[in-house]
Amino acid sequence: MKITKFLGLSFLLFAFAATSFPDGVHAEDPAAVLDFYGREVQAGASYLIDQEDFRVVNATINPICNSDVILSTGIEGLPVTFSPVINSTDGVIREGTLITVSFDASTCGMAGVTPMWKIGFNSTAKGYIVTTGGVDRLNLFKITKFESDSSFYQLSYCPNSEPFCECPCVPVGANSDKYLAPNVSYADFRFKPDARIEST
């Protein structure tokens, strides 16, 4: 009899908690990142990253071979792919979640060369910039809505993915030499499906 009463009381407490704290029990996924056409950005698909002024994200060297990430004008950009750290059931990239970013391009075959983005020091660019050669799950970024325009997004680097660093994510923009770099002027980005993929 006591066991029956205990089980009944436990059920009532659980039901009360579920109705009193619905957000904790029925947590919703963050909003999906949308591409240029208003469609959900998909993990593993190829996208070109551009700005409202039509500058596009590109690499200093292609094929990727210790290449740096830049904003360029007047030429076709180099597509990237996004991969979530925690795989979602629907394969959608969502706002504010940790991701890796990689150029969708071949590499030169040197040891340790990868198309994945990371932050590295560059004496030519006079500081830390976004470059290639990243390692999965150690070099993380996130995408959030750009403050001034809901149709554009902000890309941020999250140094808390680095060992022994509990630091906030920092926005990525373009420095005076057009290198993508952390903690410089804000940059508003949008994501266009790679036309070469769309046409296949």
UniProtKB/Swiss-Prot annotation:
GO molecular function: endopeptidase inhibitor activity
Presence of keyword Signal: yes
Top-level taxon: Eukaryota
One Pfam entry name: Kunitz_legume
Triggers of expression: By wounding.
Secretion signal span: 1-24
Record keywords, A-Z: Signal
Alphabetized PANTHER family for the sequence: KUNITZ TRYPSIN INHIBITOR 2, KUNITZ TRYPSIN INHIBITOR 5
Stated family: Belongs to the protease inhibitor I3 (leguminous Kunitz-type inhibitor) family.
Protein name per the record: Wound-responsive protein GWIN3
Source organism (scientific name): Populus sp. (Poplar)
